Amino acid sequence: AYTYLYPLEGMKAAEFWVSPEMSAQSAAEAVSRGYTAVKFDPAGPYTIRGGHMPAMSDISRSVAFCKAIREAVGDRADLLFGTHGQFSTAGAIRMGQALEPYSPLWYEEPVPPDDLHSMTAVARAVRIPVAAGERLSTKAEFGAVLRAGAAEILQPALGRAGGIWEMKKIAAMAEVHNAQMAPHL
C-alpha cells in the first residue's frame, strides 16, 4: 500500500513542500506504519499548462527529494514520482534520467497524458516505468497506451474509467501486455 507524503505534526506545510529532509522524515514515518511505497511530486510549481521544460533547479530539487527519501526508507519502500503531465518530451526525459539512480517504482504522467507519441518516447528513453491513466476514460484509450508501449503501469480512476466492470476489462488488457495496474482512486 502507498501513501502520499504529508507534513507530520508540528511541521509547517509551506516548508514541508520544499524540504527534502522533512519529506524524508514523513516517508520514514509512513514506512514505520506499514506503507511499502510513498508518493510525492516535488518538481513543481505546477501550472494548468503542460509541456514545459523543467528548470535545472526543478531537476536538482527533485533529485534532492529522491536522494533524501531513498536514504530514509532504504529498500523498505518504493518511491512513486508524480509530475501531473507537466513536461515536454525532452524535459521529461531529462528529469527521468536524473532520477534513475534512486530507482523509483514509477514516473507518473511525465508528459500530458493525451500525447501518446511523447509518452512512448519517454518510456523508451527512461529506465523508470511510466505510469499513466488517471485522466483516461475508455478502454480504447488504455488499449492505445498499451499497444504503443507508452506505460507499464496503468492508473485508471474508477469513476472516470466506467466503474468496476470496465476497470476489470482494462486490467485484463494490462495482463495481456504484461503491464501492471495501480488504480487511481
Per-range role (PLM):
Residues 38, 69, 82, 107, ...:
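Conserved, mostly hydrophobic/aromatic
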Residues 22, 66, 74, 109, ...:
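Short, well-ordered helical secondary-structure segments
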Residues 88, 111-112:
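Right-handed parallel beta-helix/beta-solenoid
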Residues 97, 103, 114-185:
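Shared catalytic-loop signature of beta/alpha-barrel
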